[in-house]
């Protein structure tokens, strides 16, 4: 007798999840190991909980989304994080992306304009024992200058251009990954590397993200 979706063996479910991520281009061993350790199901609540292991974005609170796992993996892979790196994430959301980054970097700072999301993510980080993440309610479009410079910056919301304040907070040799383009159209995921003089830009793939909005939310 075949088990139903609710009775799926956790090991088989994880194997299927990782296979889907690998089949979409996530090949870095450290990233795959991080995605194996961090259970996406812990970050998806309510009526969408049974879809946590599908490769698709899902709604969360405050009108935001948790990105599809393959995109989380590809963005993490593009950052080429070293174990001693200090990373800034713009857009905490559910906290899933920051949790993945925490397995790759020495220290992760993540900011979001929605206080509720920061509060819920912080509680979840504590529950999961992820002690190298600091989540803050802040206007992410201005970065986190008091902790700059950063080895890596990940922006999980779309900007019309790579934000100048974030570029300025990258170390020389640092990498930023950011979706660029209009929010009502397909955007391009851009990898920016800071050089001794100027920046190098590389287009990675088309994506769809919520917009990067200035200011602090009221929720």
UniProtKB/Swiss-Prot annotation:
EC number(s) per entry: 2.1.1.77
InterPro entries cross-referenced by the UniProt entry: PCMT, SAM-dependent_MTases_sf
Catalytic residues in the record: 67
Catalytic activity, reaction form: [protein]-L-isoaspartate + S-adenosyl-L-methionine = [protein]-L-isoaspartate alpha-methyl ester + S-adenosyl-L-homocysteine
Cell compartments where the protein resides: Cytoplasm
Keyword check for rRNA processing: no
GO BP of this protein: methylation; protein modification process; protein repair
Gene3D superfamilies per UniProt: Vaccinia Virus protein VP39
One GO CC term on file: cytoplasm
Keywords per UniProt: Cytoplasm, Methyltransferase, S-adenosyl-L-methionine, Transferase
GO molecular function, one term: protein-L-isoaspartate (D-aspartate) O-methyltransferase activity
Coiled coil region boundaries: none
Role, per record: Catalyzes the methyl esterification of L-isoaspartyl residues in peptides and proteins that result from spontaneous decomposition of normal L-aspartyl and L-asparaginyl residues. It plays a role in the repair and/or degradation of damaged proteins.
Family membership: Belongs to the methyltransferase superfamily. L-isoaspartyl/D-aspartyl protein methyltransferase family.
Name of the protein: Protein-L-isoaspartate O-methyltransferase
């Amino acid at each position: 007798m075949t088990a139903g979706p609710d009775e799926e063996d956790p090991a088989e479910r994880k194997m299927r999840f990782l296979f889907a991520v690998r089949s979409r281009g996530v090949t870095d061993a450290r990233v795959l190991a991080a995605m194996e350790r961090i259970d996406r199901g812990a970050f998806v609540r309510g009526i969408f909980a049974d879809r946590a292991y599908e490769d698709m974005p899902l709604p969360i609170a405050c009108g935001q989304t948790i990105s599809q796992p393959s995109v989380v993996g590809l963005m993490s892979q593009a950052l080429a994080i070293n174990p001693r790196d200090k990373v800034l994430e713009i857009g905490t959301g559910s906290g899933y992306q920051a949790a993945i980054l925490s397995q790759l970097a020495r220290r992760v700072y993540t900011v979001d304009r929605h206080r509720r999301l920061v509060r819920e993510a912080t509680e979840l980080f504590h529950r999961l024992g992820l002690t190298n993440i600091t989540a803050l309610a802040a206007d992410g479009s201005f970065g986190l200058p008091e902790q700059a410079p950063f080895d890596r910056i990940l922006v999980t919301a779309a900007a019309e251009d790579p934000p100048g304040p974030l570029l300025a907070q990258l170390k020389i040799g640092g990498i930023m990954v950011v979706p660029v383009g209009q929010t009502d159209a397909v955007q391009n995921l851009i990898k920016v590397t800071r050089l001794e003089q100027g920046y190098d830009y590389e287009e990675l793939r088309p994506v769809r993200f919520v917009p990067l909005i200035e200011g602090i939310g009221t929720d």
